[in-house]
A protein has these predicted regions:
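One-carbon transfer enzymes
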Residues: 2-167
Length: 167
């Protein structure tokens, strides 16, 4: 059962869910929202399982209306904008975006960089706020693409780095 922790506001300081857990007594209620038919659908269960093994209560949802109040809401390849009511019900609302924010705001940043011939793709973990791609930045990383990488290899690397930032 997810509880309402709206009074417990803390700041993530560059360690994803692990740092938030330390701040919030070790056990978190975590919701992961992803698009039901999106590219992460085939692998997101592995992130859920890893977080559960660490003692967290984890719920995977595909629709904004199914998001309960949580300590941490991860919005991972979630194709819908989230209302302020939903954002305000969670302690943290975290997004992983494949650009060097604030540069590269908008949809499908990895795709545009691949089209532009980039092989080193920046990736950013940040706090979701009402304005798109505008929240506080907590972590940055890079996805390194090989010359012959096809979409399956690119998505695998993207998923691995996304999950690393969330753990």
């Amino acid at each position: 059962e997810f509880a309402d922790y709206s009074a417990r506001r803390h700041v993530v300081d560059c360690k994803g869910a692990a740092r938030v857990a330390a701040l919030l007594d070790g056990k978190l209620t975590i919701t992961i929202a992803t698009s039901e038919h999106g590219w992460l659908r085939g692998s997101v269960d592995s992130l859920c399982e890893k977080l559960r093994k660490e003692g967290h209560l984890v719920l995977l949802v595909y629709k904004a209306e199914d998001i309960p109040p949580s300590d941490v809401l991860f919005l991972l390849s979630f194709w819908n904008l989230i209302s302020s009511d939903i954002l305000n019900q969670n302690i943290h609302n975290l997004v992983v975006h494949e650009s060097d924010l604030p540069k590269g705001k908008g949809w499908s940043p990895l795709t545009w960089q691949v089209i532009d011939g980039e092989s080193e793709i920046p990736i950013t973990l940040f706090e979701a706020v009402e304005k798109v791609d505008a929240g506080a930045i907590y972590m940055r990383g890079k996805i390194l693409l090989g010359e012959g990488d096809l979409i399956d290899e690119i998505r695998q690397k993207q998923a691995e780095k996304t999950y690393d930032l969330c753990e």
